[in-house]
């Protein structure tokens, strides 16, 4: 009897996780690693290349020595809003600016008060 499994991938703000689940929904294996921290003080950003590398390494760890069958699908979820800029070749332009970054808050406040004054 061939067994199949599903892969779940959660690329979160603080932790990246990969998990394998049976067709019945039972957790078979899970691996995780902390997401990289911002290298810029007072910013919420992440190196997209690091995110990519961690994600691929976790997927490799997940399937390594997983004698369970064949993966039949993969579900992916990630962080909410943010700015993840890529060039025309699909390569990162800069670090991802995360949903919880407040660098532009002063500009937003200024625009809001200017707009409200109209």
State what each model feature region is.
Residues 100-118:
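Glycine-rich phosphate-binding loop plus the immediately following alpha-helix
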Residues 1-95, 106, 110:
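N-terminal glycine/serine-rich phosphate-binding loop of ATP-dependent small-molecule kinases
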